[in-house]
Amino acid sequence: MSSLLEQLIEAFRVLPGVGQKSAQRMAYHVLEREREGGRRLAAALANAVEKVGHCVQCRDFTESEVCAICANSGRDRQQLCVVESPADRLAIEHATGYRGVYFILQGRLSPLDGIGPRELGLDRLAERLAAGEVTEMIIATNATVEGEATAHYLAQLARQHSVRPSRLAQGMPLGGELEYVDRGTLSHAFGTRSEVL
């Protein structure tokens, strides 16, 4: 096998969820059927890696120093929603009427993987909370072991700065049927049930 082909296969393997076989299929496809698409992909990738950075306020991806959401004076700066990734922020923007601002962790606490508070920019988050503008921190981390540990840490950080922490509700999906919901979700939903208003 050509060393250039091997390099291409290894390059595809940096993507999450892409193993040896998938990387090999992608490399063969680009070289056999999609050379022009491969050139566009290479140019777009090089351009993005060179020009896309992180917002100095929220850590989202942006081409400027401050992202469009943080620069928008119409957003409610008293509400700060903390999410694990830009994809989570996008999901909240599309599915809700949330008009506050965000802080993107770009991950979650995972000591075994060497990801601690510093890697998540929590020093910057603490500075933002200390400034006194934020009154509520909406913790929107995933319902995984690491996500829950991160949420606990964030709630403590919020309280240290006299900011009210809140957590996204978890439980039964809209339109879900009890018999098809996994045991963990059902147990959590049952344990955190609320009064019907």
UniProtKB/Swiss-Prot annotation:
Pfam families according to UniProt: RecR_C, RecR_HhH, RecR_ZnF, Toprim_4
UniProt xrefs under CDD domains: TOPRIM_recR
Zinc finger (C4-type): 55-70
GO molecular function, one term: DNA binding
Alphabetized PROSITE patterns for the sequence: RECR, TOPRIM
InterPro entries hit by this protein: DNA_Rcmb_RecR (IPR000093), Rcmb_RecR (IPR023627), Rcmb_RecR_Znf (IPR015967), TOPRIM_dom (IPR006171), TOPRIM_RecR (IPR034137)
Keywords for the protein's UniProt record, in alphabetical order: DNA damage, DNA recombination, DNA repair, Metal-binding, Zinc, Zinc-finger
Highest taxon above the source species: Bacteria
Coiled coil: none
Single biological process term from Gene Ontology: double-strand break repair
Toprim domain mapped to chain residues: 78-173
Function: May play a role in DNA repair. It seems to be involved in an RecBC-independent recombinational process of DNA repair. It may act with RecF and RecO.
UniProt record similarity statement: Belongs to the RecR family.
Name of protein: Recombination protein RecR
Organism, scientific name: Xanthomonas campestris pv. campestris (strain ATCC 33913 / DSM 3586 / NCPPB 528 / LMG 568 / P 25)
Gene: recR
